[in-house]
Amino acid sequence: MPKYPLLGMTLTELQSVTKDLGMPAFAAKQIASWLYDKKVTSIDEMTNLSLKHRELLKGEYDLGISAPVDEMRSVDGTVKYLYQVSDNHFVEAVYIPDEDRATLCVSSQVGCKMNCKFCMTGKQGFTASLTANQILNQIAALPEWDKLTNVVMMGMGEPLDNLDEVLKALHILTASYGYGWSPKRITLSSVGLRKGLQRFIEESECHLAISLHSPFPSQRSELMPAERAFSIKEMVDLLKNYDFSKQRRLSFEYIVFKGVNDSLIYAKELLKLLRGLDCRVNLIRFHAIPGVDLEGAGMETMTSFRDYLTSHGLFTTIRASRGEDIFAACGMLSTAKQEESNKN
């Protein structure tokens, strides 16, 4: 009989566990401390619980931490990890070390429903949403855990399409009884879903990144079908109701496609669209994927685009591309091969 994972449980849920097992009320905080602060590898290591209570706990629960089943290493130091989340399903997470920081790109779903034209995860289709345990396991089981400084929810899947479990995972990451991270170390990236965006802004203090890619609705809907359900104009109008002028950061991701969205008219329309918002724009180089007739703009074009926006008051950066040689860069994550091979 499968055991229930402790990783991914809130303090309230741990209190229910200890109550059901006849353990003292304070034992829930002890378990949370061992799990999220001391990062034990077995229930036996929870030595301030009595032997009897540890045995009771082991009878129905395990830590719920599973090591990656595979990894790929890039020449630039990026590492892509493959996690098995169930018998037949897998997700990828990407560890990106830098001089002064180390970031983990975390997945929220197996596949994705959004079907963005430029993304391999979308081409894979949607299989399942991850639980808070499966989201946090990508972090807790990371071999480089002790070096990690930042988490970005920019891996496989649309986080706002799995908002209950994503918010639960983010709560545990930032709660004092949990990992105790500052929300300023975490960024959630989304295409922008009407039903989830407002809730995320109001229930989380983590940074927000919106996938933009075109300021023109008709073109954006071709690149990103989600535009048809919740337009970028409506999204911007909603975002203007909130204060992003302090520590919380709002950014817009913009993949620059050659001859598609890289001309001056696009830069001018971006300025018009985002006027009045305290935000930044991150320009991203497109990484070619099979079967997609798009090409990335050159660095000279991207630099000119950035300089125009910045000179007109919109802070803009060019995001460094990492892990392209192992299909770990933006838009390149997919576990379609593993999913298919496990069916056979």
From Swiss-Prot:
It is found in: Cytoplasm. One of its GO terms (biological process) is tRNA methylation. Its EC number is 2.1.1.192. It catalyses: adenosine(2503) in 23S rRNA + 2 reduced [2Fe-2S]-[ferredoxin] + 2 S-adenosyl-L-methionine = 2-methyladenosine(2503) in 23S rRNA + 5'-deoxyadenosine + L-methionine + 2 oxidized [2Fe-2S]-[ferredoxin] + S-adenosyl-L-homocysteine; adenosine(37) in tRNA + 2 reduced [2Fe-2S]-[ferredoxin] + 2 S-adenosyl-L-methionine = 2-methyladenosine(37) in tRNA + 5'-deoxyadenosine + L-methionine + 2 oxidized [2Fe-2S]-[ferredoxin] + S-adenosyl-L-homocysteine. Belongs to the radical SAM superfamily. RlmN family. Reaction proceeds by a ping-pong mechanism involving intermediate methylation of a conserved cysteine residue. This is Probable dual-specificity RNA methyltransferase RlmN. It comes from Bacteroides fragilis (strain YCH46).
